[in-house]
Amino acid sequence: MSWFTPEVIDVIIQVVKAIVVLLAVVVCGALLSFVERRLLGWWQDRYGPNRVGPFGMFQIAADMLKMFFKEDWNPPFVDKMIFTLAPVVAMSALLIGFSIIPITPGWGVADLNIGLLFFFAMAGLSVYAVLFAGWSSNNKYALLGSLRASAQTVSYEVFLGLALMGVVVQVGSFNMRDIVEYQAQNLWFIIPQFFGFCTFFIAGVAVTHRHPFDQPEAEQELADGYHIEYAGMKWGMFFVGEYIGIILISALLVTLFFGGWHGPFGILPQVPFLWFALKTAFFIMLFILLRASIPRPRYDQVMDFSWKFCLPLTLINLLVTAAIVLYNTPAVAAQ
């Protein structure tokens, strides 16, 4: 009797696909470091990395070698177990969160009926990594940075969820593939859910702690925040995890508001991966452009903006969407 039944072969294929997708995300997260520096140099009219290899293309390899050979040192005053666990949780939570993204009709790690809820579970888990890092470091700057980061992340995750509820109400499902297919038959949600998109994008930048919402890592105030005691590969996991977060939020924007793997007006349906990659790359570059062009506000301004602007906007968007859906739903005759 052969072990390789059709069911076993299907499981093996799905596992291989999952490994390929997640490894590709990690590699892209590492490469984004080089892409960001090149784009910042171009936009700010200066040289980017241009010494290692042609056009500085091997700079990322040099950075990785430097990181691998740095001493993996634990300060004597830290809580070693939690100190080591924090970067692992930070990177793995975001990487697992990417598993719900449908890249093409046939490629994706997991097709969950509660896909969006699973994403929020992983996003909430990443908050613990920041708290672990700040508390276990026994450093006042690290603790202040982690408190800032956790308060900011928890606040903006509220609006992240409320911004998506308009999409869920219209589709009637938390499944990511259902949302993509709904947009293929109707308008992309960037039009009917424009205010939800704006709020989701702002909250996504804040949750990933990217400029201008990088107050938890403000060098001038907190000396790099909760990262301050980390070095070597532990710091590298935080570093790559941040870029994985950028890729994840960009992929979610594409999936939820820009039709996923579908092209505009049904153009070139034969290349779904190309459309998904191009749209995701656009939002990644938009993240980088924000760093190059917008100053950092004060921390109290960031929190005021969340509760005084984002909350009313998301609630109004959700109420209007619910009213429209209710109006367009045919009344059920009383039995």
From Swiss-Prot:
Entries under Pfam families matching the protein: NADHdh (PF00146)
Classification lineage: Bacteria, Pseudomonadati, Pseudomonadota, Gammaproteobacteria, Pseudomonadales
Membrane topology: Multi-pass membrane protein
One GO BP annotation of this record: aerobic respiration
Domain of life of the organism encoding this protein: Bacteria
Stored PROSITE patterns: COMPLEX1_ND1_1 (PS00667), COMPLEX1_ND1_2 (PS00668)
Key words, A-Z: Cell inner membrane, Cell membrane, Membrane, NAD, Quinone, Translocase, Transmembrane, Transmembrane helix, Ubiquinone
Class in the EC hierarchy, top level: translocase
UniProt-recorded name of the protein: NADH-quinone oxidoreductase subunit H
Protein task: NDH-1 shuttles electrons from NADH, via FMN and iron-sulfur (Fe-S) centers, to quinones in the respiratory chain. The immediate electron acceptor for the enzyme in this species is believed to be ubiquinone. Couples the redox reaction to proton translocation (for every two electrons transferred, four hydrogen ions are translocated across the cytoplasmic membrane), and thus conserves the redox energy in a proton gradient. This subunit may bind ubiquinone.
Keyword flag Membrane: yes
EC code: 7.1.1.-
One example GO MF annotation: oxidoreductase activity, acting on NAD(P)H, quinone or similar compound as acceptor
InterPro entries registered for this protein in UniProt: NADH_UbQ_OxRdtase_su1/FPO, NADH_UbQ_OxRdtase_su1_CS
GO cellular component terms, A-Z: plasma membrane
Subunit structure: NDH-1 is composed of 13 different subunits. Subunits NuoA, H, J, K, L, M, N constitute the membrane sector of the complex.
Family per similarity comment: Belongs to the complex I subunit 1 family.
